[in-house]
From Swiss-Prot:
Cofactor or coenzyme needed: Mg(2+)
Keyword Transferase attached: no
Annotated compartments: Cytoplasm
Source species of the chain: Acaryochloris marina (strain MBIC 11017)
Function, in words: An essential GTPase which binds GTP, GDP and possibly (p)ppGpp with moderate affinity, with high nucleotide exchange rates and a fairly low GTP hydrolysis rate. Plays a role in control of the cell cycle, stress response, ribosome biogenesis and in those bacteria that undergo differentiation, in morphogenesis control.
Protein name, entry field: GTPase Obg
Length: 350
């Protein structure tokens, strides 16, 4: 399945139904008063988060969404039927912006959460509302008001507790594949992974923790180099980062610093996100060189460095145990705070 994590759509709420001009014409009321009903309200356009969707791919092929118009008012003071709302399902983690101003409108993070993005137009008044002492038989009614319409920019930020980061070819995809049932594309060249991969890693408690393999970051990622903005966006919601460094690289310390600089330059507090620092591919190193690189990296980072080989599945139990301990220790609200919904009569949570 192709991964799409941002797109634009057009939404149009239904127009309100027109009010009606009608008069009472019962058998014993030959000259009855006005009895035209109001038009029905137009349907609204509502976004709803769903765990059944993992990508915005559906919106690649369908960009326009229109709700139903309200029906015209009827005789005998009958109000026209309201138009049916248009419900649009999006993946959990979708952030919604006004595409023209890039004003933040809302953030749908939980299954079933909704946001009304375009309100249906009000129905027009029937002629019964224009009865007065001076006009006992009004022959006019009001048309319904048009429904709102907007262009929306949708962005998907993955909801994963643990993000695996590192330079291209550090072994992130291999790690997530051996820890979970995820099967990302794996090859021995940089930038094999061009989309984030999600995997659920089981715990002894019976629970599962979602890991995200973030595609390789490079120098300049915070400025958008190498799709850096697209990749870093998915780190924002993680509670814990597993920073993978290739032990066979010429300068692991420099590789570590490169990623740290990009996290810091991107902002959003990513440089302060809790991390576990990991040297991967230890099966390809002799022990003396490995211990030297581990010591240098620990001295530079001020953190313990865990040794693993994702391919040979060495050191994974120790790493996972540390991941579980960190997650249990960290507060659940460490995940990025939900983006507030714009306080507007037009765009609001429902």
């Amino acid at each position: 399945m192709r991964f799409i994590d941002q797109t634009e759509i057009f939404v149009k709420a239904g127009d309100g139904g027109d009010g009606m001009v009608a008069f009472r014409r019962e058998k014993y009321v030959p000259a009855g008063g006005p009895a035209g009903g109001n038009g029905g309200r137009g349907g609204s356009v509502i976004l709803q988060a769903s765990t059944q969707l993992q990508t915005l791919l559906d919106f690649k092929y369908k960009h326009q969404f229109v709700a139903e118009d309200g029906k015209r008012g009827g005789p005998k003071n009958l109000t026209g039927a309201s138009g049916q709302d248009r419900l649009i399902e999006v993946p959990c983690g979708t952030v919604i912006y006004d595409a023209d101003s890039m004003t933040l409108l809302g953030d749908l993070t939980t299954n079933g959460q909704t946001l009304t993005v375009a309100q249906g137009g009000k129905g027009g008044l029937g002629n019964k509302h224009f009865l007065s002492n001076r006009n006992r038989a009004p022959e006019h009614a009001l048309p319904g008001l048009p429904g709102e319409e907007f262009r929306l920019h949708l962005e998907l930020k993955l909801l994963a507790e643990v993000g695996i980061i590192g330079l291209p070819n550090a072994g992130k995809s291999t790690l997530i594949s051996v820890l979970s049932a995820a099967r990302p594309k794996i090859a021995d060249y940089p930038f094999t992974t061009l989309i984030p991969n999600l995997g659920v890693v089981p715990r002894a408690t019976g629970d599962g923790t979602v890991f995200a393999d973030i595609p390789g970051l490079i120098e300049g990622a915070h400025e958008g180099v190498g799709l850096g903005h697209d990749f870093l966006r998915h780190v924002e919601r993680t509670r814990l980062l597993v920073h993978l460094v290739d032990a066979t690289a010429e300068d692991p310390e420099q590789d570590y610093q490169t990623i740290q600089k990009e996290l810091s330059a991107y902002g959003q507090g990513l440089q302060n996100r809790p991390q576990l620092l990991v040297l991967n591919k230890i099966d390809a190193m002799d022990s003396e060189q490995l211990l030297e690189k581990q010591a240098c990296l620990e001295q530079m980072s001020g953190s313990p460095v865990y040794l693993i080989s994702a391919v040979a599945q060495q050191g994974l139990d120790t790493l996972l145990q540390q991941v579980w301990e960190e997650l249990d220790r960290l507060p659940n609200d460490l995940q990025e705070a939900p983006i507030p919904v714009l306080d507007s009569p037009i765009l609001r949570e429902t």
